[in-house]
Amino acid sequence: MAAEAEEAARHNNIKALYDNIRVLTNKFKKSSRPVKDKLGNTLKTAEEQMKRWVEHFKEVLNQPPPPHDANIQPAAAELPINCNRPSKAEISKAINTLKNNKSPGPDNIPAEVLKADLETSTQMLYELLGKIWEDENIPQDWKEGHLVKLPKKGDLSICDNYRGIMLLSVPGKVLNRVMLERMKKTVDQKLRDNQAGFRQNRSCADQIATLRIIIEQSLEFTSPLYTVFIDFQKAFDSLDRSVLWKLMAHYGIPKKIITIIKNIYT
């Protein structure tokens, strides 16, 4: 295995080198925990546990659509967002913004590999992303990922007490970042002022500060105040994606970009 890693390095085969190093260092060690089925029975074999995890995430990630179709109308005109193929400058910037020391997707290509030779990586992705942009066809490898479960609170033998994250292809994230940068500034101007989450230079801390001011004023003027806190169960996992495409059209996102994003998830 060490000889294979050395040979891969000699031939500049970064992917093979990374694969061999990962095996040699035994970086990922599987830990076994008891897993219970829906009835609370402990599953003993690895096969039974795997089937239970598959069952759990299928249910979480494939929620039935809402009973009534959302009546969301598209904008009268599209926003002035660049719909040309990604430029080399955009791709290079997107690569540089990728975070290091993050687990890669199934292709085992981490961000560090793309950054090691930025010029070559940019040129290769320029050709690839250009074809993807023209054909609106996303590589199947970019649609697949490693599903990793992260423990939350409570009994860790119960599947509901885990949060799943998907490790996707890093080169695929370059395309996502290019589209995000194109949309971000223009779309931000269309969002409601009271939305703080998922916005640049704003966070939920802004909402907490606002709520505190409202409470203090209510106490000062002895006026009644009613607050409602809603915690949606598995909010992001249970979204109906067909509604997302309608919302994007409602905000004026160009059809070209919606189609490409939609094809990532189908």
Predicted regions located by residue number:
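Conserved catalytic palm subdomain of right-hand nucleotidyl-transferase polymerases, strongest
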Residues: 34, 91, 98, 102-109, ...
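Conserved nucleotidyltransferase catalytic core and NTase-mimicking acidic/glycine-rich helix/loop elements
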Residues: 4
